[in-house]
């Protein structure tokens, strides 16, 4: 930048600013400003032409007055005239005034644009930079329309100076963020990628920021940047601090550029080229190695720069989720930060480990730090760090440590900050249900929750414990005994009274044989709490009382006396009054048989997924990211509520981090009729449709019941299937995106995760399959602040798929607000074996521009695999029966991932087959069996996987009764290793 000459000091401006600062009152300041405005106006209107220096001085004064908060309605033309000056300082002040005061509706905008175009067309790099800075500072749509085509040309021009390229890249980035549709993609996109090889580090830094933003919407246009980014990163990471002296910050070479390059690489999957991938892995290992080296400076700036690169490196390792060694090393490095004296580092380490805990490769490594995390939960002074510690405990929990983690979280709950208590309660409830070893422990845990933090136990939590106790005969007696003892405490939370009233009303007879819990004692205990409770709880207790009359006839007179009391029959609350009147009449006129029929025990609730997960997601809020679990499987976990027995492909640990994606909420438990009118037991409390006794459902009906979406608003809507949306023909949609096959392969061995994500949209999947049926939930998240219009996701059946796979889709809202998400339900039925997955076409308008996206839906033939156990003799007999050449498919291939027996086992289980032990003579080999269920027929499948660790090779052999199925399954499974 040219040096400012001595004459450019503008003494008059300095005097004016000094006068303003010396004013003793607001009135004095306004008086001085008005005097100056009158002077400037007279100068501008005078007959004597002003020179450039005077114009600059007066324009600066106007700008200063405007920044003080006063309106300026003149001087704009003089500022525009300064743009035509050939002196840098005058042109600079003109651009400064334009950037701050002139809006896009100004009458002078055409003159301003002409001046900017003249400067852009000049060969003076200083003037070009001033013009580019002005465009970026204003950043309006009008500026974008005027210059969006010129700036890319300047950026990639061979004769542009480095400073101009740098300014052009940042200017284009500003315009693209403001109006993405105005920046044309063209030949320049390929050339801008090569700026990553530029010798000027400032140009590279600006180019990386631009490419990172552009590639999120147009990844294919910039995919060549991966190899260049890896190459540039490698040169930075491996360089000594003296090699990049001008860009070394406290002994750390180019930290800002390193972080930007690592973020750019997170926009793409791992490189397919082995050489590029090897070089990148070497870079990541180098960063992890440098983190272990002693610091070269004690300055905080050195550690900040070093740690910024390290954490971004760990984020990239987590993003790839394909290098077990790096994931474990990252986990160990983060473990060292857990006890760092810097609070921010401890927070970031806990946050990153939450994500690592959801990876199958690093989950065990994360668990080794459980004691440190528990200590952080107890001793951290910063509430945000304690909250992250609780999140990490939740993420690392599995069957082996569930009791310890739940116990520690309960202990922490007693002293936890009020702001996070409800969230801790929800997490404890979810973990207790998911990893319960026995139901008595689950009941004890929930009752402890109510005792410790009753005010924060939401309805979803205590609804759920009632649901589970009702459905489990083996825990009903224990629950009745435990809740009876809990109610004997002098101070008893109202939620405990609700749970106790319900359970004793249903199962109090199971403990009535003990004199200490005889029927009169049970009634007396409950009624002692009656007058201290809210109307809703008293209504529930009245329903319990009428149940007692049926269970314990000896209490009839006492209870009728309570119902007959004036405080009940003439209660000011109409609900309590009606219940008292109707229950009293029912107990007086109904025979014993009628009373027993009306007040019979509640039938089991329909099995559904817990709504507590959805409650937790809502509590975390949209900024918490995806609450959708990411596919880390825990084969030992079990559904405590008695749904289908989970297989490794359907069980996963929820990730605490999440972005826009949520879990569906189940409706509250339903209640059967207890009497006519308002006398339904708990019907008002649970506010759900009545559960009528019925014959046992078919397996298909039971399965769909377990996968029930959120409760419809009307009871009749429960009977309706999702309305099928219009299915456009394949010719109406574009081809799948280039990475569609790669995205599909991610879901071959898992059912839950993020299917697609770019700058605008995130699509998550949660699915479950049984026999030939499946249900899939698609979550569409709007990542922008702008509403999507005409949003239309549809499923397309290419070729003959319509006759092979039936997919019913439910329409979604045509508008998706910024930051919001919508859910689409798909019911899937496999009619016969198929080779091609259906396509998902997503169309919408964003900012007036049409957007279209076509993906492959993660529905592959192995999703309808049912694992089959068989003895070795049966396996070999069946293997010989499938001996025809067309029934066998075999593939020998190189391992694409580290060969780990546990990982291989998890993938085979996730694929859907059962693993058979002691069948193959070689214990290193894997043998599996299963049946593919279709509506038309069943296809038996046997597989054998032979790893050769020395040669880093696999041999995969599959035999099925249908040739196409053998070949297709072999291809699908081979891609996973």
Swiss-Prot record:
It comes from the Eukaryota. Its main location: membrane. The modification Phosphothreonine is found at residue 653. It is a peripheral membrane protein. InterPro entries: Adaptor_Complx_Large_Subunit (IPR050840), AP2_complex_asu (IPR017104), ARM-like (IPR011989), ARM-type_fold (IPR016024), Clathrin/coatomer_adapt-like_N (IPR002553), Clathrin_a-adaptin_app_sub_C (IPR003164), Clathrin_a/b/g-adaptin_app_Ig (IPR008152), Clathrin_app_Ig-like_sf (IPR013041). Residues 615-675 are annotated as: Disordered. Coiled coil: none annotated. Expressed in the brain (at protein level). Isoform A: Expressed in forebrain, skeletal muscle, spinal cord, cerebellum, salivary gland, heart and colon. Isoform B: Widely expressed in tissues and also in breast cancer and in prostate carcinoma cells. One of its GO terms (cellular component) is membrane. GO terms for biological process: clathrin-dependent endocytosis; endocytosis; Golgi to endosome transport; intracellular protein transport; negative regulation of hyaluronan biosynthetic process; positive regulation of neuron projection development; positive regulation of receptor-mediated endocytosis; postsynaptic neurotransmitter receptor internalization. Residues 646-665 have a biased composition (Low complexity). The keyword Ribonucleoprotein does not apply. It is found in: Cell membrane; Membrane, Coated pit. The keyword Transport applies. Adaptor protein complex 2 (AP-2) is a heterotetramer composed of two large adaptins (alpha-type subunit AP2A1 or AP2A2 and beta-type subunit AP2B1), a medium adaptin (mu-type subunit AP2M1) and a small adaptin (sigma-type subunit AP2S1). Interacts with SGIP1. Interacts with HIP1 and RAB11FIP2. Interacts with SLC12A5. Interacts with clathrin. Interacts with RFTN1. Interacts with KIAA1107. Interacts with PICALM. Together with AP2B1 and AP2M1, it interacts with ADAM10; this interaction facilitates ADAM10 endocytosis from the plasma membrane during long-term potentiation in hippocampal neurons. Component of the adaptor protein complex 2 (AP-2). Adaptor protein complexes function in protein transport via transport vesicles in different membrane traffic pathways. Adaptor protein complexes are vesicle coat components and appear to be involved in cargo selection and vesicle formation. AP-2 is involved in clathrin-dependent endocytosis in which cargo proteins are incorporated into vesicles surrounded by clathrin (clathrin-coated vesicles, CCVs) which are destined for fusion with the early endosome. This is AP-2 complex subunit alpha-1. It comes from Homo sapiens.
């Amino acid at each position: 930048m040219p040096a400012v000459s001595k004459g450019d000091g503008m003494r008059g401006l300095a005097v004016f600013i000094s006068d303003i600062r010396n004013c003793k009152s607001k009135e004095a300041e306004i008086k001085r400003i008005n005097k100056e405005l009158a002077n400037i106006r007279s100068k501008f209107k005078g007959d004597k032409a002003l020179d450039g220096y005077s114009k600059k001085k007066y324009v600066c004064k106007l700008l200063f007055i405007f920044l003080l908060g006063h309106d300026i309605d003149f001087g704009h033309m003089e500022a525009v005239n300064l743009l035509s000056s050939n002196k840098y300082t005058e042109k600079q002040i003109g651009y400064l005034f334009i950037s701050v005061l002139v809006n896009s509706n100004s009458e002078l905008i055409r003159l301003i644009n002409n001046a900017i175009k003249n400067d852009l067309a000049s060969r003076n790099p200083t003037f070009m930079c001033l013009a580019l800075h002005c465009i970026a500072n204003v950043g309006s749509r009008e500026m974008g329309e005027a210059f969006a085509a010129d700036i890319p040309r300047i950026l990639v021009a061979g004769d542009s100076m480095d400073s101009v390229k740098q300014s052009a890249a940042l200017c284009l980035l500003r315009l693209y963020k403001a109006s993405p549709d105005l920046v044309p993609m063209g030949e320049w996109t390929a050339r801008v990628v090569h700026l990553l090889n530029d010798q000027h580090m400032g140009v590279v830094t600006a180019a990386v920021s631009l490419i990172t933003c552009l590639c999120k919407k147009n990844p294919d246009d910039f995919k060549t940047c991966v190899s260049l980014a890896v190459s540039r990163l490698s040169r930075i990471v491996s360089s000594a601090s003296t090699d990049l002296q001008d860009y070394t910050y406290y002994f750390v070479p180019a930290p800002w550029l390193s972080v930007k390059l690592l973020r750019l690489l997170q926009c793409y999957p791992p490189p397919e080229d082995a050489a590029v991938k090897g070089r990148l892995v070497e870079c990541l290992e180098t960063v992890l190695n440098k983190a272990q080296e002693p610091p070269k400076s004690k300055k905080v700036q050195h550690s900040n720069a070093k740690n910024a690169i390290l954490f971004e490196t760990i984020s990239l390792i987590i993003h790839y989720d394909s290098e077990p060694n790096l994931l474990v090393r990252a986990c160990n490095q983060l473990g060292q930060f857990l006890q760092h004296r810097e609070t921010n580092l401890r927070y970031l380490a806990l946050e990153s480990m939450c994500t690592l805990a959801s990876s199958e490769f690093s989950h065990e490594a994360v668990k080794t730090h459980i004691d440190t995390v528990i200590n952080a939960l107890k001793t951290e002074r910063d509430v945000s760090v304690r909250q992250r510690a609780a999140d990490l405990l939740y993420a690392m929990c599995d069957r082996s440590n569930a009791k310890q983690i739940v116990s520690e979280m309960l202990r922490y709950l007693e002293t936890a900050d009020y702001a996070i208590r409800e969230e801790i309660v929800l997490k404890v409830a979810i973990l207790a249900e998911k990893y319960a070893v026995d139901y008595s422990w689950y009941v004890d845990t929930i009752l402890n929750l109510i005792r410790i933090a009753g005010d924060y136990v939401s309805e979803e939590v205590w609804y759920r414990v009632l649901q589970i106790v009702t459905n489990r005969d083996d825990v009903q007696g224990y629950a009745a005994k435990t809740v009876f003892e809990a109610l004997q405490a002098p101070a008893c939370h109202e939620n405990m009274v609700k749970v106790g009233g319900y359970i004793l009303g249903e199962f109090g007879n199971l403990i009535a044989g003990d004199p200490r819990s005889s029927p009169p004692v049970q009634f007396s205990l409950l009624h002692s709490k009656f007058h201290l409770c809210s109307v809703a709880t008293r209504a529930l207790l009245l329903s319990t009382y009428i149940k007692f009359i049926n269970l314990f006839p000896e209490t009839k007179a006492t209870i009728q006396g309570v119902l007959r009391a004036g405080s009940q029959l003439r209660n000011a609350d109409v609900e309590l009054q009606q219940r008292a009147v109707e229950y009293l009449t029912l107990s007086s006129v109904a025979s014993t048989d009628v009373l027993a029929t009306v007040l019979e025990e509640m039938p089991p609730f329909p099995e559904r997924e817990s709504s507590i997960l959805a409650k937790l997601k809502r509590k975390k809020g949209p900024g918490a990211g995806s609450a959708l679990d990411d596919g880390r499987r825990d084969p030992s976990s079990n559904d405590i509520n008695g749904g289908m027995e989970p297989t490794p492909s359907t069980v996963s640990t929820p990730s605490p981090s999440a972005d826009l994606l949520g879990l569906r909420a189940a409706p509250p438990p339903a209640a059967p009729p207890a009497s006519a009118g308002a006398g339904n037991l708990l019907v008002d409390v649970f506010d759900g449709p009545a559960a009528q006794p019925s014959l046992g459902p078919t397996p298909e009906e039971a399965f769909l019941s377990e996968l029930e979406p959120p409760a419809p608003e009307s009871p009749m809507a429960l009977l309706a299937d999702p309305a099928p949306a219009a299915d456009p023909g394949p010719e109406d949609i574009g081809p799948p995106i280039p990475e569609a096959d790669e995205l599909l392969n991610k879901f071959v061995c898992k059912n839950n995760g993020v299917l697609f994500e770019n700058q605008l949209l995130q699509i998550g999947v949660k699915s479950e399959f049984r026999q030939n049926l499946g249900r899939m939930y698609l979550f569409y998240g709007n990542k922008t602040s702008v509403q999507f219009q005409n949003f239309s996701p549809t499923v397309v059946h290419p070729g003959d798929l319509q006759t092979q796979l039936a997919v019913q889709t439910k329409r979604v809202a045509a508008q998706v607000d910024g930051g919001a998400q919508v859910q689409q339900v798909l019911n899937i039925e496999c009619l016969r074996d198929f080779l091609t997955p259906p396509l998902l076409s997503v169309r919408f308008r964003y900012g007036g521009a049409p957007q279209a996206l076509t993906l492959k839906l993660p529905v592959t033939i192995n999703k309808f695999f049912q694992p089959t156990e068989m003895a070795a003799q049966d396996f070999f007999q069946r293997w010989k029966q499938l001996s025809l050449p067309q029934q066998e498919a075999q593939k020998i291939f190189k391992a694409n991932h580290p060969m780990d027996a546990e990982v291989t086992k998890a993938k085979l289980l996730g694929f859907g087959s059962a693993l058979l032990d002691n069948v193959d003579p070689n214990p290193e080999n894997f043998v599996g069996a299963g049946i593919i269920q279709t509506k038309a027929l069943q296809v038996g499948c046997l597989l054998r996987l032979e790893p050769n660790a020395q040669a880093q090779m696999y041999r995969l052999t599959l035999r099925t009764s249908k040739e196409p199925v053998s070949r297709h399954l072999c291809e699908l499974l081979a891609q996973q290793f």
